[in-house]
Structure formats: C-alpha cells, structure tokens
Amino acid sequence: MLDIKGYLVLFFLWFISTILIRSIFKKPQRLRLPPGPPISIPLLGHAPYLRSLLHQALYKLSLRYGPLIHVMIGSKHVVVASSAETAKQILKTSEEAFCNRPLMIASESLTYGAADYFFIPYGTYWRFLKKLCMTELLSGKTLEHFVRIRESEVEAFLKRMMEISGNGNYEVVMRKELITHTNNIITRMIMGKKSNAENDEVARLRKVVREVGELLGAFNLGDVIGFMRPLDLQGFGKKNMETHHKVDAMMEKVLREHEEARAKEDADSDRKKDLFDILLNLIEADGADNKLTRESAKAFALDMFIAGTNGPASVLEWSLAELVRNPHVFKKAREEIESVVGKERLVKESDIPNLPYLQAVLKETLRLHPPTPIFAREAMRTCQVEGYDIPENSTILISTWAIGRDPNYWDDALEYKPERFLFSDDPGKSKIDVRGQYYQLLPFGSGRRSCPGASLALLVMQATLASLIQCFDWIVNDGKNHHVDMSEEGRVTVFLAKPLKCKPVPRFTPFAA
C-alpha cells in the first residue's frame, strides 16, 4: 500500500500533468477560430480524424466544416484552406503575414539549419536567394544553357524503354524508370554526371537524397507536441544527423572536385559548366552585400535533387495512367504532335508552345494529381482570414488537391477533360497558367514563396510526355487499359498506390538504334 508520501507524489504528478495539458490544449477564449471538429483529445488533438492520407482526410473535413477549417495536431494550431478564395486571401491579400514556411525538426537538421531556399525564414537573406534563383540559377538563360542535356536524356530514356521492354514484349515499372530519368536530368544539370553502371557515386547520392525525402515526410511527434521535441522518442534526431552527414560529405566532395577542375583549367577550356560551377561563381563573388555561403549552395543543390526528381516523375506517371484510361485524349494529343512535328523527327522543347492540347493534358493532370497535394505556410503574427482569427505560429495548409477538385470552379470536376484548358473560340490557345496567377490551380504554389523551379519542371514534363505519346503505344493489363487502379499513396509527393506497369510498344523510332 502507498504511504502518505506516495500519495503526495501521485497528487503532485497529477496536478503538474493537469496544468501542463491545460496550458497546451486550452484555446485562447478571445480568438474566433475557423470551424472544425468539436472534440480535441489531450496530446493528440484532432489526429484521430486524420488517419487516412492527410490531404484526403482534410478534404473530407472541409466538406463538413467549410473551405477554411481549424484543427489541432498535437498542440499545434493548423488552419486548412480548401478553396480558391481562401487561398487567395492567404497567398495574396494577407501574404506578408504568411511568408514563412513551418520549420520542422527534419528540415532544420537536413538543410544546414534551414540555409536552403525552401525553408529559410523570410527576410533579407531569403530575398537575396530568391534573386539568385531568378537571375542566375533558374533563369531562362540558364535553362536554355542546359537544353541539350534535357533533350539527350529524353532520347536516352526512349532507347531504354525499347531495350528493357524487348520492343514492347515485356512490362515496365514506369515509376522506377521515370524517377531514374528525371534524376539523370537533374544530376547532369547540377554536377555534370548521371547515374549508370559506371557511376556508383551518383547512385549513392540518389539513395541518400531518397532518405532525405523520407525523413522530411515522416511524422515526428516533436514537431507537434512541444515538450516532446528534445526527447526524440522516435529516434528521428539521430537518423536526421546521420543522413545529413552523408549528404554533406557527398556535396562537399562534388564542390571540391569542381574547385580543383576550375583551378586547373585556362580561359580556353571547353569543360561544360553545370549548376555547381554557377554556385561556386556566386560563392567567390566579391563586393556583394550578401554572399552565398557554402552551406546555402549545398542546401540549394539538395533542394534541386529532391524537388526535381520525385515531383516530375509523379506527374508523368499520373499522366500516363490517365492517357491509357482515356484513349480519345491520347489519340488527340498524338494527332496534334504529328500535325506540328511531322513523322520524321522527335518532338522537342521548342515545339511545346505550338502544342496547346499537350499543355492542356499536363494541366489537367496537375489539377487532379498535383505532386504535392498540400503546401504549408506559417503565420508570422496573429491575423484574420475570412473573419476568423489565425494565431501566430499556426501552420497554414493550402490544399491544392481539394481546390483542383472544387465543383464551384470545375465542371465535371472529377473527369479528365483537358479541353477545359482551351479557349472554345480559339482552341489553338491554352488558357489558365499553372505558375500561381490563378488560385483555382496551384500545383507550384503562389506568391513570393512559390516554387522557383516551375519552369524547369514544366520543360522536363512536357518534353518527356510528348515523346512518350509520339513514340509508343501503351498496353496495360493485357489491353484492359481502363482498369488502371488510381488509388494514391505518399506523404510529401503523391504517387499511384500501385506503380503503373505498361508495355511500351514502339511506334516511331526517331533516332539511330
């Protein structure tokens, strides 16, 4: 039996626990929060409502409580916008209050203390990095410099499709090949190398970058329950640091190789320059008010590896799945390509502006299957949206997935109809851009912190998809193409739950075998 001291200890623990829990979960009485589920469980908040894929669970809650809802995830205030109007108010009308991204434990550990463009807090140095992205690293001139790399990788990808499918006799797991393809483009642009049997270094880097993506998408209790942050009950702290050290060692090795190569070359050197060369130029630049740090350069390269690989691969897999399920769309896209390009050469990036239906196909995929179904901001101060109070430091989630399926904006919202993006009186022109000006379609975000790599991603996806339409017929499920399972999986990037398996039957071979 317990003596009086034992009872006092239990009472003290109960008292402290009660005060702690109330201090964590009690909502400020004077705040008028957006509507949401009525029951918040201690320590968990509304997490039991979010057991399925997060974007799907939040969409279901929005159908019940409205386009702007409030939930507690642990002790964290989370506000979710699921309509174009609420997204516009957050990303444009009140943008200055929402210019930060939430800084998670993993992102802080893996990106050199948030030294990258994606997670760095809004301010002077962020504006400096933004300027570098737009004028140097991802400018139109820089993208044009790498056009031959992208085109040669498309050709190599098509040849590989023919080889591994036995000219259409065997199924190919498209996700694996698409990820390899997009990764090869990015690694050649960044460091002048690609993944192949002779280059284990790039293969190792790709594996580590995949680990980074998994850690960034993992649910860490310390991110949502403040007092658990230093406890690291799930062991993510150790995993984050181990992975960061591996990434840093590889990035540092590449930087040093570039420095050594630059030291040896003369003015007439014909060595092809890549993004690491541009980064080194910026690191070494004199007289700037801000200087690019070595850590920011490595963090930027890591951002490029992550965003430039899985996102485009996801969209391409979804596009193929929709095309094989909708043969009339596939037929129309191919006819457009042949009418513009002919039947004697491979479609190129320079042809894309003359292919409005192909552009519409990709837009329709991005509407229904955005690679990142939710993107996040953070409230830098307490403010109001739609008449509701948004507490300072709240996480703001913009559901691009829900907005793209909103019947208030899209007729037959769940049907795959690329024609919706063409002007009815001039089908030769495409309407509605995807770079953030139209709030009913936000696959790359909007505003100051929209994705700076949108133009590069579109170039890669459009040219690759056009070539796959031009060069192959696609057979799924022994010809039962309409039976493709369109279920979803994934946290940060959403893929098909069951990877798409196709037989690519060659139809047009525009290059030497």
Curated annotation (Swiss-Prot):
MF terms per GO, please? heme binding; iron ion binding; oxidoreductase activity, acting on paired donors, with incorporation or reduction of molecular oxygen, NAD(P)H as one donor, and incorporation of one atom of oxygen
Q: What GO cellular component entries does it have?
A: membrane
Q: Which residues bind heme?
A: C451
- State what protein this is by name: Beta-amyrin 24-hydroxylase
Q: Which SUPFAM superfamilies match?
A: Cytochrome P450 (SSF48264)
Q: Which reaction does it catalyse?
A: beta-amyrin + reduced [NADPH--hemoprotein reductase] + O2 = 24-hydroxy-beta-amyrin + oxidized [NADPH--hemoprotein reductase] + H2O + H(+); sophoradiol + reduced [NADPH--hemoprotein reductase] + O2 = soyasapogenol B + oxidized [NADPH--hemoprotein reductase] + H2O + H(+)
Enumerate the cofactors the protein uses.
heme
Can you tell me which family this protein belongs to? Answer: Belongs to the cytochrome P450 family.
**Enzyme Commission code(s) on record:** 1.14.14.134
